[in-house]
Amino acid sequence: MTAVRKQDMWMISSVVDEHNHDVSPTKSRLIRGNRKLNMQVKRTLDLNDQAGVRINKSFRSLVCDAGGFENLQFVERDARNYIGKQRRALGKEGDGQALLNHFSAMRELNKDFFFEIDMDPDNRISNVFWADARSRAAFMEFGDVVSFDTTYLTNKYDMPFAPFVGVNHHGHSILLGCGLLSAEDSSTFVWLFRCWLRCMGNKSPEGIVTDQCKAMQNAIQMVFPNTRHRWCLWHIMKKLPEKLIGYTNYKEIKHTMKQLVYESSTAEDFESGWNNFIELYDLELNEWLHTLFEERHRWVPCYLKCDFWAGMSTTQRSEGMNAFFDGFINSTTTLQQFVVQYDNALRSKAEKEYEADFSSVNTTIPCGSQSFIERQFQEEYTHAKFGEVQNEFRCKMNCNVKNVVFDGIRTKYFVKEALIWKDESADKMREVIFDPSTKDIECSCRLFEFRGILCRHSLMVLAQEDVRCVSQKYILGRWSKQIRRWHTLIRASYNTKKDEPNVKRYDFLCKKFYDIAELACESQSGTDFLVDQLESLSKNASIRDAGATSLGAQKDMSSTPNTAVEHNNILSPVHVKRKGRPRGLRMQSTVEKIGKKKNM
């Protein structure tokens, strides 16, 4: 194309179109100069990223909102680039420093936020512990029994995630603080447990459930000497194939051992049965079984059922917390991103607790019988715990009193329960002791002592004795819906991200627009009126000029160097080498597993 300028005008003198391509208006949106992200798109991406929504899902939602790809002014790569830029801006001072700044901001918002960072001689982060104010308050009510585990390793530095998990009045898992560790040795666990102990006002839990890790056991004995410590039963039984598969009669050994572990009513029954079991299958030289027997008081149910464990016999509550992070966390996740997702977990758990509180107080689960005792628990317990009580009432139908012995003070009932499991059935005899003068009751199954729920055998005897109201000692305040709990008055988390002034104004205006739009959309006339008003406003010179001025000022502010105070320039941790756990065997998120399959 040739152009000639004549008298302040450009004249086209010739055009050669040999090198031109056909015009394609529909593809013009893909030209880089035509692609852009407006404020609404950026805000959506930011909020979704904070909530842990993956970018591909955020992009799909924007496509649906626009009515198709062809209606967007950007492509998925633009969205990824924007989020990547935002994340880099947040962590430009380094991951370690960013984590410290985040924790410091949390403490400024609530002085009861607790954190400690352990650093190596090079000023790099080694270990981290933190707990928000709500978790600290919740510990005072539900910190009697906790589960602790370190199986989840998905983050940029391969640092194990170590949550302290309790059980609230709805039976929900509740977070009571957590750590990220550089090692899984005794000294590291001692550091973490001491941090947690200081955080909780030097109050130790009454019981703690862990796996068989010797380093954990040593640390617990040192930091929590008066705390009951039990091993995860599920992990032990899961190892049976690995430890016993070499024996020719493995299936028979496995069946006998399971029956011995789960069916032994007393310690004497277990010990005599174990000796017979070892001798019968010639297992005297099996070191693993020998170690298990030496530590039987840590894992065999009949040794542990007399103490309160809130129903916990495994660490699966700790491992269950990992499911929340699945899909949001991967091997490139920074420490700060991990902590943000942890905050999301806190908010999610708190919301579920609020909903369960509301449901328990404002709705009623009908009784399944005419029992006065069932009605008593209906009035006192949360829905979840009352549901457990109702299950015992239903199972009471499988119980029958076979014999009664009175010694002049107390009455001993022999209650036979018909048990059905899959295609097998069996009878189990329980001894229930009832004191007519005090109405106290005690069952050999120890469900009340272990779980805090009156068992079916006791309910059978109470009905036999025509007891219509149980003592308050059998109605645990821990499961009550009538108690106002202090931790529920504390916010679960605080947003430390400081939005730019124009973003705050944008959010404020959007909320106003949504309210007006909801009113206007009720009729066509209202819609037409609002559209006319908006079009008139968009042409208003004062609004356009003010917006341009504000945008220029915003750009000037964005170029201003960060003047935040640095805290000794804390460095990011080094990549952790797993001791005794090969990296290839670490627990991975579903996202990583799918990614590996695609690359095979």
Describe each PLM feature range.
Residues 1, 92-100, 104-119, 132, ...:
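Surface-exposed, charged/polar loop-rich segments
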Residues 5, 9-16, 50, 67, ...:
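Charge-rich, intrinsically disordered regulatory segments
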Residues 8-47, 131:
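Basic, short loop/linker segments at the boundary and entry of helix-turn-helix/winged-helix-like folds
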Residues 29-37, 156-157, 178-201:
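Active-site beta-loop-alpha junctions of metal-dependent nucleic acid enzymes
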Residues 51-62:
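Short, charged amphipathic recognition helices of the HTH superfamily
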Residues 63-77:
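Short, basic interhelical loop/turn and adjoining N-cap
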Residues 76-79, 172, 176-178, 207-215, ...:
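Conserved beta-strand -> loop -> alpha-helix junction used to position metal-binding or nucleic-acid-contacting
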Residues 85-161, 167-168, 288-293, 304, ...:
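Structured nucleic-acid-interacting core domains from mobile-element enzymes and related host factors
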